[in-house]
């Protein structure tokens, strides 16, 4: 089954476990003659790489990506692009006692229920490490979008809340996002959040967060009714990021409190929209406005506080997780969210070309 | 492209416009030898049917479903099941002036941007009418789940909020849901909500809402990492319901404020879980707990209040929508949400059979 | 599962049994703004319709197609196109004794082995009647190809052999194909073949045949390595026609006897090819030459000669089939082959647009 | 697009070019808890490996496969299995003059027409080298079939004809296949064929061939009507092998000459079939009889005889191919055919489990 693939025409299949020899992905359907080299991908991986601040896991790996196929003399050939990162820092001894007991809130029990076996080393396939390949694929999607749509395409994400604290949207500054290790767009939130994270880390606990991702410069017409909706695909993509429990497009849950005249974005010739409650998508199709998605991500289950659980044999036990863990996985979800947005948009761009491109 | 299909193994393809001769769907992959007749489907359609209370559109149609293939002597044969409902009440004259102008907040402009053509009669393909076929497909999914899993499977939804007012969860009563025309589980909310809806309707306006859907009695092991996640598929399915702008699983957005020890559901032998913050899904795989999804749905864009807009020719105009419309599309989204949940679960059950069923 | 669909981007899903109320198909992915009406489809159905000569089944039905969705004011809208034909002549009494015994060479035993149930009326889903919807879908594919590629597209098939007799290729005349009831391109073969068929019919027997289908006027670049090969898709499409047991592209099985210098088609500037051993496809991709496929179709299993068989209960029995049957199903496979070729090409055209269309 | 994948539930995606750093594949959907190690795969690769006799290309590589994911402690985990073989012998200088001119009969011109770029080193993606990964995937499919169906599953292929000479079927001996370097089942054909191949090789030419592949011990019920037919999938899989131009199931093209009573396989209680004209498949579904497929493969286009062609710039030129090439690619197609058969059957086995497994 294609459970490890996403996208229909820009199709990404990822493979690999946290502590196996390598992780990788295959991108099938990328158009030919795009300029692509490892230099287009590596910077995005570097952004996501752990060990860069005290707020992400201390696992240290170069995460050096290699292009193994699909590129010739600096250009894509239209054949599958295989990307691989070798795992170099695999301190699997840290995870020894995890082999026989389940972490509450973690996927390990669900894997065992389904498969009757799991690679427990570092979370195996459920590790956030898998998201490195999403970031790599997203980098290729960015090249595709830049080449086919134009330099004006911008896909950016930011951390907008943590532990119940949220930014002041009026202070949103995209440049600030690049300046602090939390990808926070509100300079005044950075200090308090760093203090909160330090305290969480000291407690051996973890904390939830919210992330917003915005795509600008995309054409109208991406997406399709009724089950090929751009917002439905984005919702699936964002909900598929490890730990995400809620997803919004545009005004999101706030629409529940609105009346029709408050929610409808007035249209002026252009077309120009006087507001963007819709988050750039109507009827599942992009309108040319910024595409806005938002999600909440739970606190990681790997904490030092003991929680009641059971062993594989079904006996009661208390579980706490030693080892290196992010106190807030929302931080590293920021580059992943951008990458997933880029992949979904690249996919829908090709889908639109296929069906509707002929008469333009 | 398969934009009008959902599901991989229990695959539903819908077709039809609001004011065409009929709407229908084809279900491919349904197992053979399930007892199925129109009587298994019709009651669910009757629940969703418009015109039953003053809070839903006054379009009156019997919505009589016909099984055109795939069933022989009262049993499914394993071949595609074709379902059809004829459109009998198509007062298309109501929509005449909509042909040349766009309703702010409506899909019509997006369809035109993408396709350069749209069937403007009653919203065409973007009409909520299409969801009748989801309900029909959901009824078949229920038969599948009941037969393969057991009578204990329950998939139920309820209206949990409207216009910013929410139910008191402590008063949740599933029986109440069947007793009031709003599918509200809190008897004390019904009166005030009916009053609110009357006022909204009198104003020619509309209002947003929230819906919760719960599936019980399902086995552990449905879903898959990493892009076949049950929660990701549910998120896509719910976000694909007309007007939905936000989706949650389990605690949803509330997780952003939680610490790891608050979020993790403790596990006791069984396994039993002491709480259900996860909404029945860990790592994209069901755990056997109730599966809980929630979504927010925007106020419909068809309102009597004039909103600035443009014509197809790009000229400024004010638009207001005459005709028959639901003041709160969240109400009729309740049976649709149940149906989508049923379809997603049926699909994942078959997917699990395929990959993991062999050794059980 | 999508077992009743074919095509990826021009996606056709068929449904319906021989003796159910109707048969139909849904075409998903058709581009918008193609001029389409029932008049574009009906003539192709009329060509295939049974009862037109003494060499095809005497079942008489108008096979009147209805477009139920996806077309508005004479143009496709980009939404799914639903086509339906009502079954009007369903003399199911003819098939009564078939319910409990298996016809040697027929699909009925295989269906029962797989599904544990089958709709035995007229072959149910395995009936050649299903191919009417392929012809209908093929007619839409022709409109697509004509609109997107040009009027020069020609997709034609002919009966090239019957019962071991073959045409003389030097007498091939496409006009002759339309003049005789066998779709035979060689005027001198028609008489002897009619005599053979009369004798076969008198004997209550049936006979095998070969069909060749040729597509001209298509661009180079359709298809893809390695599992999206145009020839592999054509082979699957042709082998999927009821009764087909062998498929060839270009020189087909004759290549087994050739040396490299005999098989290679020399290339001149243009590019022009000095011959077409390849059948218009190299490496799975079209070259702009005529695309040539050929297949062999077995004699139908419905014959008056008794053959040893068993009942559903596993008891020995002799089976002979009364009722109306084609003495040579190869004849009616001719329009079906054209339709499948058209659908495969339409699909690959859209696939090529998606991936490679951007820079052209 | 998923052009580089095959299978729906046992899904194989291959990547890599002849002269890139490596080739590989990802298998998604393999059931968990199958015993699998590199030792299960390597022997099949060794069978296919070039350089083992004077009749296959002299490229010498160990073709050492590595499992990079999806296996833990000797068992599959249900997550994607990534396999990789490093390319170690990449004498790309041999192919230098191929960069600017097209080989008649080769895929290079078609790739250029489609993509506007091609990796000309050793045929790039169109190289037979890609088939190594099919053999590797086939080895995993064999493990799946052996585990889920039983030790009785046998999937074997043999070279049945070369240059117009064919074996005597009455001398068919599966043991002989393993004894000669041509995989020929007829001991008396081996000598003359070796002489023919020596002469072909001396001439710098190449020759066509036929291959037959037989699967035994499989259950009835694999496949599905109407577009999920087992024979249609096999036809697509076989036609997708490099150079294949014709495919047959069972009696294949011979059916064109048969009458109904000659073609129908009589059925006795069991069910037992008195003959196997059908090749083990009726109505697209397996019957439990041996599944028999056959194909013709063209002579490779890489020959020393000059053939008229053009350069990339469209100028006339004569092309002959230096370098290491198989005089008869049919020989190395034998293990590839077995592998494709195994993959298709594994896929259909899982598909059957999904839909029909519930009541057994």
Curated annotation (Swiss-Prot), chains A, B, C, D:
Its EC number is 4.2.3.5. Keywords: Amino-acid biosynthesis, Aromatic amino acid biosynthesis, FAD, Flavoprotein, FMN, Lyase, NADP. Pathway: Metabolic intermediate biosynthesis; chorismate biosynthesis; chorismate from D-erythrose 4-phosphate and phosphoenolpyruvate: step 7/7. The keyword Repeat does not apply. It is an enzyme of class 4 (lyase). GO terms for biological process: amino acid biosynthetic process; aromatic amino acid family biosynthetic process; chorismate biosynthetic process. GO terms for cellular component: cytosol. Gene3D superfamilies: Chorismate synthase AroC (3.60.150.10). CDD domains: Chorismate_synthase (cd07304). InterPro entries: Chorismate_synth, Chorismate_synth_AroC_sf, Chorismate_synthase_CS. It comes from the Bacteria. It holds the Pfam family Chorismate_synt. Reduced FMN (FMNH(2)). NADP(+) binds at residues 48, 54. Its cofactor is FMNH2. The keyword Cell membrane does not apply. One of its GO terms (molecular function) is FMN binding. FMN binds at residues 125-127, 242-243, 283, 298-302, 324. Homotetramer. This reaction introduces a second double bond into the aromatic ring system. Belongs to the chorismate synthase family. This is Chorismate synthase. It comes from Gluconobacter oxydans (strain 621H). The gene is aroC.
């Amino acid at each position: 089954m294609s459970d490890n693939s996403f996208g229909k025409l820009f199709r990404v299949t990822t493979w690999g476990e946290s502590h196996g020899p390598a992780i990788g992905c295959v991108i099938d359907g990328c158009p030919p003659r795009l300029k692509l080299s490892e230099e287009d991908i590596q910077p995005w991986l570097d952004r996501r790489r752990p060990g860069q601040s005290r707020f992400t896991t201390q696992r240290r790996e170069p995460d050096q990506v290699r292009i193994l196929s699909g590129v010739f003399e600096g250009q894509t050939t239209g054949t599958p692009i295989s990307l691989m990162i070798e795992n170099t820092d695999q301190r699997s001894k840290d995870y020894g006692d995890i082999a026989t007991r389940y972490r509450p809130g973690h996927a390990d029990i669900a894997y065992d229920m389904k498969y009757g076996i799991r690679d427990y080393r570092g979370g195996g396939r459920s590790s956030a490490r898998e998201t490195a390949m999403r970031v790599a694929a997203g980098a290729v999607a960015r090249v595709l979008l830049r080449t086919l749509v134009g330099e004006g395409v911008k896909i950016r994400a930011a951390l907008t809340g943590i532990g119940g604290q949220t930014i002041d949207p009026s202070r949103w500054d995209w440049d600030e996002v690049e300046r602090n290790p939390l990808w926070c767009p509100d300079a005044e939130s950075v200090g308090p959040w760093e203090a909160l994270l330090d305290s969480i880390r000291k407690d051996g606990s973890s904390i939830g967060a919210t992330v917003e991702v915005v795509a600008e410069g995309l054409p109208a017409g991406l997406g399709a009714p009724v089950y090929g909706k751009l917002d439905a695909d984005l919702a699936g993509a964002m909900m598929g990021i490890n730990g995400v429990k809620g997803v919004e497009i545009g005004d999101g849950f706030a629409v529940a409190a609105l009346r029709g005249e408050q929610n409808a974005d007035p249209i002026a010739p252009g077309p120009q929209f006087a507001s963007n409650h819709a988050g750039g998508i109507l009827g599942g199709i992009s309108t040319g406005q910024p595409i806005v998605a938002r999600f909440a991500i739970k606190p990681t289950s790997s904490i030092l506080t003991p929680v009641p659980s059971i062993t594989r044999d079904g006996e009661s036990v208390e579980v706490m997780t030693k080892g290196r863990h992010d106190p807030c996985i929302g931080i590293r979800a920021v580059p992943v969210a951008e990458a997933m947005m880029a992949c979904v948009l690249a996919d829908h761009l090709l889908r639109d070309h296929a069906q509707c491109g002929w008469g333009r």
